[in-house]
């Protein structure tokens, strides 16, 4: 190139090049923004793992600080003297940020003085579910390496609490497995079922993955795992068909995820409200509804487990039992909390047919009902029902003797008996309240009785 042409090009393009790259003396270097949000992905980008660790603190609960290396953590607002909550989302079909994550983080930080680490693996969880499953081991290793940096700063293993949603629950279990079960706690919010129901203990969440492991099951007949995987396993409303969720396909996407995501909303509600989501150990949901499991003595020595940021779920016995199924009922919307009651009806005389009685609690325009059945040639029938208000706020009970709709099976003979009720857990007979006089019930005709129970 001739010198004249070279000089011409230099003076024409040189200043533009200098302006585009900046100078070390006059232009300040660009800095990363303080707050970082979740990534977005799509099917065209595949499912390559691209993990972000976002730190949220009590001093700035809405700002996610990107922390990747040890130096990032040391220069952040991370407080090694506080407990650390690690939140791991699950499969993201559309590659979007979880809609619940901001509210979840805020609820945790309001309920606990802690560090919150949100694990953003949207890239690796997008597209095909089975591709996301293949990323679980690699993701678990990345999280484990990140936690090792926290341990170097003086964080104790026992102060780390992993909260995993769906597929994220099994990621948390694998991380706990890498730490030989010495992490403080793992909470699985409806742990994923597909590919994990028959998986080995090393591949899925189980009670050996942390000092305390709990799981909340809300969709065992579809996307959630149906087997117990922790020390305590909450089967909410039996673990499936949650109140308020659509029952038919025409509801579309909401039909698919409503039951599954109810575990997340229950946990948020438990953090935001004082009404306890208390559960009761029982062999089966059917037995629980039948009134066969009224306290928590076996195996918890009366300490009934509760959903939320309660130390070991409120279970303080040693050693901890494993894979204990506990059951609770809820309402159809937040705060979901109910007060469980035992309801009983004692016949004055035995009958030759089964006797069905509908029991309804009424208080402040809120009603709850349950049907109890007294088998033929027996005197007692019982069941468990749920009501949003405590018993002392229930004004009346409505009793209705139900008969068969089939003409040839109708029995119009009135029944006479005594109604009794008690709030769960029923630890002694002093809690039981009975209507003073026997009640005479005509077939199909409701009878209203006042309830007078003192608040304590």
From Swiss-Prot:
Entry EC number(s): 3.1.1.111
Name this protein carries in UniProt: Phospholipase A1 member A
Signal peptide: 1-25
Disulfide bond annotation, renumbered to this chain: 245-258, 282-293, 296-304
Described function: Hydrolyzes the ester bond of the acyl group attached at the sn-1 position of phosphatidylserines (phospholipase A1 activity) and 1-acyl-2-lysophosphatidylserines (lysophospholipase activity) in the pathway of phosphatidylserines acyl chain remodeling. Cleaves phosphatidylserines exposed on the outer leaflet of the plasma membrane of apoptotic cells producing 2-acyl-1-lysophosphatidylserines, which in turn enhance mast cell activation and histamine production.
Subcellular locations according to the entry: Secreted
Residues glycosylated per entry: 365
Entry keyword set: Disulfide bond, Glycoprotein, Hydrolase, Lipid degradation, Lipid metabolism, Secreted, Signal
Keyword flag Amino-acid biosynthesis: no
GO molecular function annotation: phospholipase A1 activity
Family to which this protein belongs: Belongs to the AB hydrolase superfamily. Lipase family.
SUPFAM superfamilies recorded: alpha/beta-Hydrolases
PROSITE patterns to which the protein is assigned, alphabetical: LIPASE_SER
Entry GO CC: acrosomal membrane; extracellular space
Main location: secreted
Catalytic residues as annotated in Swiss-Prot or TrEMBL: 166, 190, 260
Pfam families: Lipase (PF00151)
Single GO BP term: lipid catabolic process
Organism superkingdom: Eukaryota
């Amino acid at each position: 190139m001739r010198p004249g042409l070279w000089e011409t090009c230099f003076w024409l393009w040189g200043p533009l090049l200098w302006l585009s790259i900046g100078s070390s003396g006059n232009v300040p270097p660009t800095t990363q923004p303080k707050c970082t949000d979740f990534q977005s992905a799509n099917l065209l980008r595949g499912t390559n793992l691209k993990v972000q660790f976002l730190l949220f603190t009590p001093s700035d609960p809405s700002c996610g600080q990107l922390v990747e290396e040890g130096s990032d953590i040391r220069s952040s607002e991370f407080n090694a003297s506080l407990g650390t909550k690690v939140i791991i989302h699950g499969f993201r079909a559309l590659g979007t940020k979880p809609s619940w994550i901001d509210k979840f983080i805020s609820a945790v930080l309001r309920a606990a003085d802690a560090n919150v680490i949100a694990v953003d693996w949207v890239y690796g969880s997008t597209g095909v579910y089975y591709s996301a499953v293949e990323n679980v081991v690699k993701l678990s290793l990345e999280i484990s390496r990140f936690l090792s940096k926290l341990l170097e700063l003086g964080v104790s293993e026992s102060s780390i609490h992993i909260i995993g949603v769906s597929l994220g629950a099994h990621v948390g279990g694998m991380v706990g497995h890498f730490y030989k079960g010495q992490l403080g706690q793992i909470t699985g919010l409806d742990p994923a079922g597909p590919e994990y129901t028959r998986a080995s203990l090393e591949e899925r969440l189980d009670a050996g993955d942390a000092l305390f492991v709990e799981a909340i099951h809300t969709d065992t007949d579809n996307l959630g795992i149906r087997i117990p995987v922790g020390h305590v396993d909450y089967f909410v409303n039996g673990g499936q068909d949650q109140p308020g969720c659509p029952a038919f396909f025409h509801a579309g996407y909401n039909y698919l995820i409503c039951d599954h995501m109810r575990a997340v909303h229950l946990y948020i509600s438990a953090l935001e409200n004082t009404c306890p989501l208390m559960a009761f150990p029982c062999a089966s949901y059917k037995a629980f509804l039948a009134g066969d499991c009224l306290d928590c003595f076996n195996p918890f020595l009366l300490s009934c487990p509760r959903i939320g940021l309660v130390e070991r779920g409120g279970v303080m016995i040693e050693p901890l039992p494993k894979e204990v199924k506990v059951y609770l009922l809820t309402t159809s919307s937040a705060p979901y909390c109910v007060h469980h009651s035992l309801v009983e009806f004692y016949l004055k005389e035995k009958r030759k047919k089964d006797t069905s009685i509908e029991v309804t609690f009424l208080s402040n325009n809120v009603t709850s009902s349950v049907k109890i059945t007294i088998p033929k040639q027996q005197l007692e029938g019982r069941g468990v029902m749920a009501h949003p208000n405590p018993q002392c706020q229930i004004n009346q009970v409505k009793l209705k003797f139900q008969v068969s709709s089939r003409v040839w099976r109708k029995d119009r003979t009135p029944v006479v008996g005594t109604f009794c009720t008690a709030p769960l857990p029923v630890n002694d007979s002093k809690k039981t309240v009975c209507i003073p006089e026997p009640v005479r019930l005509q077939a199909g005709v409701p009878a209203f009785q006042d309830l007078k129970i003192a608040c304590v």
